[in-house]
Regions:
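Gram-negative bacterial Sec-dependent N-terminal signal peptides
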Residues: 1-33
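Predominantly soluble domains enriched in secretory-pathway, periplasmic, or organellar proteins
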Residues: 34-463
Length: 463
């Protein structure tokens, strides 16, 4: 399920004044209008969200919440109601549900929709995202195999030395009671070993839940992020025993982790602190973090990490500032900031070291940017399906693979930014890793209220 939710701050509201003014003018000419400058709802908390994937020619389901019971609502785009002649009135819970027919010729992208309320008066704006329609093709280029694992899969990482796939999972919000680290045979996808992380002694019914994962083949370890504890941990590859659980609040909302094994370093993106945390993988000590500095005023929130070990560069993308960051690992500092025009909610990043290309996937705008690292220029803006979350570069086959989560697809892109395949890949793919031998491992994290449901890993092999 993909949710586009209204989130309007006072700082952003002035950007929408002209849109709101137009809506008010239209509304005053209708029965909806109460007159100019009637009593306004100064505590207005109404918001509207669209549910599911919306494409040209489809029908959108809209949900309103936080309105005053009995409040009348218009939803306007270019001065026209997007729900036709429907009269929207908030029920006793301050909510409503409505349908909107999306024209077949609607442009894909984010469309600002004005929320014009009356009785009492208020106005705001939400973005309605119309995603591209996608077709399945290129299936004959791949073999595909899937196997059930456990609930709540997040990421996987392959160990060339051990020839094993390590998969992490966590279910629900804190307190998290279900989380696992799995050792998987990459050929058969059979689970060979599994453990549940230790209980957190400071939080009732909560374990040190696992989210991000990377392997250290030099020291025989697995590094994981324990996001809910703002920390990281280290486990043995051999028996999955705990080597070290770092203290809480070591890495603010730790998201991804990557290991530069040859240089005894691990790097974790600190989503909540605008920095990349650094660790010595041999001594298991924390080192000074690398600060990320945006071109704008907001502090960046780094998401995915992509390591170019040969050139000693690390790349990350900030979900809130529309930027990618280049880190010089020799100097242990930020080297460059790359602006990402036409994107929102960037989350996935992958580097092609030899080609000096960077790929950035953005959930909010359904696109992947292909960037020339030598010039910093955007080579191509590639529209994919709804909600591209993560991306990985497969150097063997010279293809970037995108986990298009909301569409349940994986898209393969060549170095020209052309889609060479778009594959059905199970429900809600969350992450993709590669073994460097032409095998891609897709982990699925499908929302389900069924406690007996399990998510799966899919192996894609390039023929």
């Amino acid at each position: 399920m993909q949710i586009n939710t209204l989130c309007i701050s006072n700082k952003k509201a002035f950007k929408r004044v002209s849109q709101i003014a137009l809506a008010v003018a239209v509304a005053m000419g209708s029965a909806h209008a109460q007159g100019i400058f009637d009593q306004a709802d100064i505590d207005f908390k109404g918001n509207v969200s669209s549910m599911g994937v919306i494409t040209p020619g489809s029908e959108a389901t809209l949900q309103g919440r936080g309105f005053t019971p009995g409040q009348e609502i218009l939803l306007l785009s270019n001065g026209q109601s997007i729900v036709g002649d429907q009269k929207l009135v908030a029920n006793q819970d301050g909510e409503f549900v409505s349908k909107a027919a999306i024209p077949a010729n609607a442009a894909v992208g984010l469309h600002p929709v004005v929320i014009q309320a009356a009785k009492p008066s208020a106005a705001a704006v939400f973005d309605l995202k119309i995603s591209p329609k996608t077709e399945i093709f290129g299936v004959e280029q791949f073999t595909q195999q899937s196997a059930p694992m456990t609930r709540g899969l997040y990421q996987s990482a392959y160990s060339p030395k051990e020839n094993k796939l390590y998969v992490v999972s966590s279910v629900g919000r804190p307190p998290v009671q279900q989380s696992e680290l799995l050792k998987v045979n990459p050929e058969t996808l059979a689970i060979e070993a599994r453990i549940t992380p230790a209980a957190d002694p400071n939080r009732e019914n909560h374990v040190y839940a696992l989210y991000g994962v990377s392997v250290d083949d030099v020291n025989g370890n697995i590094w994981v992020t324990t996001t809910r504890n703002n920390s990281v941990a280290v486990y043995k590859q051999s028996d999955l025993s705990l080597v070290k659980q770092f203290d809480d609040n070591t890495v603010a909302h730790a998201r991804d982790v990557v290991v530069d094994a040859a240089n005894n370093r691990a790097y974790a993106s600190a989503f909540g602190a605008g920095e990349v945390a650094v660790f010595d993988t041999k001594t298991l000590e924390q080192l000074p973090s690398i600060a990320l500095n945006s071109k704008g005023r907001q502090a960046p929130s780094p998401m995915s990490l992509s390591l170019d070990a040969g050139n000693q560069k690390l790349y990350t993308v900030s979900i809130n500032t529309g930027e990618a960051f280049v880190i010089d690992l020799k100097e242990q500092k930020q080297e460059n900031v790359i602006s990402l025009p036409g994107t929102r909610s960037g989350s996935g990043i992958a580097v092609a070291p030899t080609e000096q290309l960077l790929w950035v996937a953005s959930q909010g705008t359904d696109n992947v940017l292909l960037i020339d690292l030598k010039s910093g220029d955007v080579v191509k803006d590639i529209k994919v399906g709804a909600g591209p979350l993560n991306i990985v570069w497969d150097d063997k086959d010279k293809l970037a693979f995108v986990a298009v989560r909301a569409n349940g697809q994986v898209t393969a892109l060549n170095t020209k930014g052309e889609a060479v395949a778009n594959l059905e890949a199970g429900r809600q793919p969350n992450h993709i890793s590669t073994d460097g031998k032409g095998n891609l491992f897709v982990v699925h994290k499908a929302a389900s209220t069924d406690k007996n449901a399990v998510d799966q890993v899919t192996r894609l092999h390039v023929k």
